[in-house]
UniProtKB/Swiss-Prot annotation:
GO cellular component terms attached to this protein's record: plasma membrane
Record-linked NCBIfam families: PRK13741.1
Species in which this protein is naturally found: Escherichia coli (strain K12)
Induction: The expression is positively controlled by the product of TraJ.
Subcellular location: Cell inner membrane
Cell membrane as UniProt keyword: yes
Keywords in alphabetical order: Cell inner membrane, Cell membrane, Conjugation, Membrane, Plasmid
Role of this protein: Involved in surface exclusion.
Name of the molecule in the record: Protein TraS
Length: 173
């Protein structure tokens, strides 16, 4: 179980890592990979459904476009989060119990989301899939925010931002 004391102590460890200059610049592929997988999945599911269930071409096209557009939005959100995650020092990621818990929870949410989208694609085509995918995405986003937000992930982001500001100020002087 994660306590406030564990979070505070790990934030102090993170600040020490950041002060020593251990911030990494992750590769673009590391950030984009899961988002591209989600986007591809959201396009693939309605295509698969169109081969298994007879429907109009316009319904398939609508479902694919809706899934692709929503997948693109998710791609950018996931890439931003992954870039922040991979910018943390590697040693900190290996030893941090908070980051390990958050990472495992996000993997579960990822798998559940992919499964729900797959099942939803068989409930209806076209606009039904589009609205359903949006609804599922919004509900999952709220659940993730409620669950992960408890760990005050904002503290990690603040620590990284303060490091970036300090580096900019030191270059100006």
């Amino acid at each position: 179980m994660i306590t406030q004391q564990i979070i505070s102590s790990e934030l102090e460890v993170l600040k020490k890592h950041i002060d020593s200059g251990d911030i990494r610049i992750p590769s673009l592929w590391q950030g984009l990979k899961p988002g591209l997988i989600i986007m591809g999945w959201m396009i693939f599911c309605p295509l698969l459904m169109s081969f298994l269930i007879t429907q109009k071409t316009s319904e398939t096209l609508t479902a694919v476009l809706a899934g692709g557009w929503l997948g693109l939005i998710i791609l950018f959100i996931v890439a931003r989060i992954r870039m922040l995650y991979f910018s943390l020092p590697e040693e900190f990621l290996k030893t941090s119990s908070v980051m390990r818990v958050i990472s495992s929870k996000l993997k579960v949410y990822f798998i559940v989301y992919m499964g729900v989208i797959f099942l939803w694609s068989f409930l209806g085509g076209g606009i039904i899939y589009g609205f359903g995918a949006i609804l599922v995405t919004v509900i999952m986003a709220f659940l993730i925010q409620l669950d992960i937000g408890r760990y005050q992930f904002v503290g990690v982001i603040d620590a990284i931002n303060s490091y970036v500001k300090n580096k900019k100020l030191s270059r100006v002087k």
